């Protein structure tokens, strides 16, 4: 009996406390706490979704770049076979090589080098004529050409700064006939053009791209630094480059805390507070 009487007094005291307006503060605090927790949960889900998308886009980008490079090697191997079989003349090389470079703008040119490592021809000729007759003197091309000759396999240079400016890399493919070295072909690339032309369009429109060296210095970039998530990016190694060269993909998009969302939060908060006040005013 006494316990029931005590419970009734406590209940009556709580109702009185609520009706006096003290409960309004508690309800408002609980509402905003729950609302804030909901927003934080939604924001984390938003970030997780962006991270998943940028990770997938990075994998797609690296995969497409490698497929593009693999296709170029296959073409250079075909040229090497035609040259070894003495079916490729300088004239036909200029014609088909120039067309291939036009169709694959990540390439600057394709260079024909003889067994003495002297440049004999280059496709396209326009803009590259001045290198004919030169030897292979730059450290990375010299290393890769010798390695390709020794291994009889295509060999990439590391990324290096080109004389013309910007960063470049090359792939060297040897030419042998009856175990006799005949020379090489070199595919000469622009790192910036590789980013621009070797990536799928659906990935380009959603991301900002950078190629970095081992010290995280930017070697090439593509895209506009606008509306990007600095915290939502993915770094992936680019095979076959050495020296820790990586591709960093940063996601485009709007921040979770956008202006429209903030306005919506303020409106909802105002409506909720007005509703709570109206309910307690009628008690």
Task: Give the residues covered by each predicted segment.
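Juxtamembrane amphipathic/hinge helix adjacent to a transmembrane helix
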Residues: 2-8, 233-254
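Juxtamembrane extracytoplasmic/periplasmic/luminal helical "stalk" adjacent to the first N-terminal
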Residues: 27-88
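Amphipathic, soluble alpha/beta structural segments
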Residues: 13-17, 57, 61, 161-170
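Intrinsically disordered, low-complexity polar/acidic regions
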Residues: 85-246
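Cytoplasmic juxtamembrane amphipathic helix immediately C-terminal to a transmembrane segment
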Residues: 278-283
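Extreme N-terminal signal-anchor transmembrane helix of membrane signaling/transducer proteins, especially
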Residues: 3-48, 265-277
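Membrane-interface helix-start motif
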Residues: 17, 198, 248-268
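An N-terminal domain-start capping segment
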Residues: 18-27, 70, 128-129, 133
């Amino acid at each position: 009996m006494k316990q029931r009487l005590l419970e009734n007094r406590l209940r009556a005291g709580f109702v009185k406390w609520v009706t006096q307006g003290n409960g309004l503060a508690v309800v408002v605090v609980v509402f905003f706490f729950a609302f804030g927790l909901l927003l934080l949960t939604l924001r984390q889900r938003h970030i997780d979704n962006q991270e998943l998308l940028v990770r997938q886009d990075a994998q797609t980008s690296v995969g497409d770049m490698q497929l593009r490079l693999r296709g170029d090697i296959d073409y250079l191997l075909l040229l090497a076979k035609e040259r070894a079989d003495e079916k490729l003349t300088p004239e036909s090389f200029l014609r088909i090589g120039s067309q291939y470079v036009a169709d694959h703008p990540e390439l600057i040119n394709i260079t024909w080098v003889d067994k003495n490592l002297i440049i004999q021809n280059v496709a396209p000729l326009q803009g590259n004529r001045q290198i004919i007759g030169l030897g292979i003197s730059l450290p990375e091309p010299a290393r890769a050409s010798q390695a390709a000759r020794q291994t009889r396999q295509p060999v990439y240079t590391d990324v290096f700064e080109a004389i013309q400016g910007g960063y470049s890399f090359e792939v060297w493919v040897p030419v042998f006939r009856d175990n006799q070295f005949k020379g090489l072909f070199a595919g000469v690339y622009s790192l910036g053009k590789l980013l621009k032309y070797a990536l799928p369009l659906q990935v380009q429109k959603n991301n900002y791209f950078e190629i970095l060296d081992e010290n995280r210095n930017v070697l090439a970039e593509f895209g506009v630094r606008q509306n990007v998530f600095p915290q939502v990016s993915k770094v992936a190694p680019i095979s076959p480059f050495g020296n820790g060269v990586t591709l960093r993909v940063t996601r485009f998009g709007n921040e979770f805390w956008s202006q429209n969302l903030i306005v919506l939060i303020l409106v909802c908060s105002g409506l909720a507070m007005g509703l709570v006040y109206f309910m307690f005013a009628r008690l």
